[in-house]
Curated annotation (Swiss-Prot):
Gene (UniProt): smpB
InterPro entries xref list: SmpB (IPR023620), SsrA-bd_prot (IPR000037), SsrA-bd_prot_CS (IPR020081)
CDD domains the record matches: SmpB
PANTHER family tied to this protein: SSRA-BINDING PROTEIN, TMRNA-BINDING COMPONENT OF TRANS-TRANSLATION TAGGING COMPLEX
Spans traversing the lipid bilayer: none
Species for this entry: Francisella tularensis subsp. holarctica (strain LVS)
HAMAP family the UniProt entry points to: SmpB (MF_00023)
Subcellular location: Cytoplasm
Presence of the UniProt keyword RNA-binding in the record: yes
Family: Belongs to the SmpB family.
Protein name: SsrA-binding protein
């Protein structure tokens, strides 16, 4: 075995989350999967666009994360692409997330799904929703940074 660690390979990202929310704190969570789900994840059949995390009975659950079943994977099992999946977190992390979610305006969303060794991990975040004017300001800042880089590139060419 190699002594060098390979960077975790990203399976899916929730790009809409960075546009719609202000990220406050990130957590790494394991996820409970069935065999056909792992096979579909290896094929890249994951969508995390409208997914979110809920805490129920002291456990974290991932909702609306679509894992599309492969046609060749276990045909004898009825596959539910939008099933809720359990997230594996420490008790202190769950309590911290639960305390923040109960406050008005806070939510918990998944940011990305990636491989860490042979296991699938989900990066979740405590987030606060952006208002329309915040989104516009963020877009203006991004456009100005891009324009500034273009101007510097032309000036020093």
């Amino acid at each position: 075995m190699s002594k060098h660690k390979v960077s975790p390979a990203t399976i899916a990202k929730n790009k809409k989350a960075l546009h719609d929310y202000t990220i406050l704190e990130k957590f790494e969570a394991g996820i409970v999967l069935q065999g056909w789900e792992v096979k579909s994840i290896r094929a890249g059949k994951v969508q995390m666009v409208d997914s979110h995390v809920h805490i129920k009975h002291g456990e974290a659950w991932l909702f609306n994360c679509l894992i599309t079943p492969l046609l060749s994977a276990s045909t004898h099992v009825v596959a539910d692409a939008a099933a809720t999946r359990k997230l594996l977190l420490n008790r202190r992390e769950i309590n911290k997330i639960m305390g923040r979610i109960e406050q008005k305006g806070f939510t918990c969303i998944p940011l990305s799904m990636y491989w860490k060794g042979p296991r699938v991990k989900v990066e979740i975040a405590l987030a606060q929703g952006k208002k329309v004017h915040d989104k516009r300001q963020a877009q203006k800042d991004k456009d100005w940074a891009r324009e500034k880089d273009r101007l510097f590139k032309k000036a020093y060419k």
